[in-house]
Amino acid sequence: GVSVWLDGPGTAFVDLLQFYDISPQVSTTVVDGGFAVHVENFIVDGEVRYTLDGRDPNAEDEIYAGPIRFDHTATVKCAVFKGGEALASAEVVLHKHDAIGRPPELTSPYSPKYTGGGNGALVDGVFGSGYFNDGFWQGFVRDDLEATIDLGKVVELHTVRARFLQNVRSWIWLPTDFEVYASEDGKKFWKVGAVENEVPIDREGELVEEFA
């Protein structure tokens, strides 16, 4: 929390208190099947340093000088330093998989209120949190979600995973089931797996479930 106090001999009249988030803003894009991480700094004369191995950055780590490019799963942590001291930080976890850079074809549109970042959000490697309005979840209203992903070539897959959110107080529920179909020509499909949801429809809280 934040505490504010005024030290003075008499009565103080306060009209407005404003607080600003000085944390660096991190955004990601998919480039050539890999990731590009962009960092925006709001601290004057601050210096952004980052790591890709999950460590908290220190004053000796790599200086951010432009988009950070890589093509593997990584936890990107960045911090703004000034005078050798870390003043603010941010992080993002990116997961590499075979559908990176392959936006799905959807039979039903996603909600304009919950785009998750656009057409490639379902396969961009960024996981949503437990908060439905964090900007990373893509929402579908009433219609079933059916997504077809063209990997560009025949690929041997061992696992297909999808993450879903339930928050009954916000009228968000997990799917009743998750089915996976495969095709070699994009025309003839056969079922290769299915998972039924076992979470009660009335279970409250912010639930993130992975179906595989």
Positions of PLM-derived features:
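Residue-level detector of beta-strand face positions
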Residues: 3, 49, 77-79, 148, ...
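Short, conserved beta-strand segments of beta-strand-rich sandwich/propeller modules, principally
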Residues: 1, 75-77, 159
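Aromatic, loop-rich ligand-recognition surfaces of beta-strand-rich domains
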Residues: 11, 16, 20-21, 128-195, ...
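Solvent-exposed beta-strand/loop surfaces of large extracellular or lumenal domains
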Residues: 54-63, 190-204
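Noncatalytic modules at the cell exterior or secretory-pathway interfaces
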Residues: 1-2, 212
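Short beta-strand-plus-loop segments that form exposed binding edges in beta-rich domains
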Residues: 3-9
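Short acidic, glycine-rich loop/turn motifs
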Residues: 6, 80-82, 184
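Short, compositionally stereotyped local motifs that mark structural "simplifiers"
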Residues: 22-145
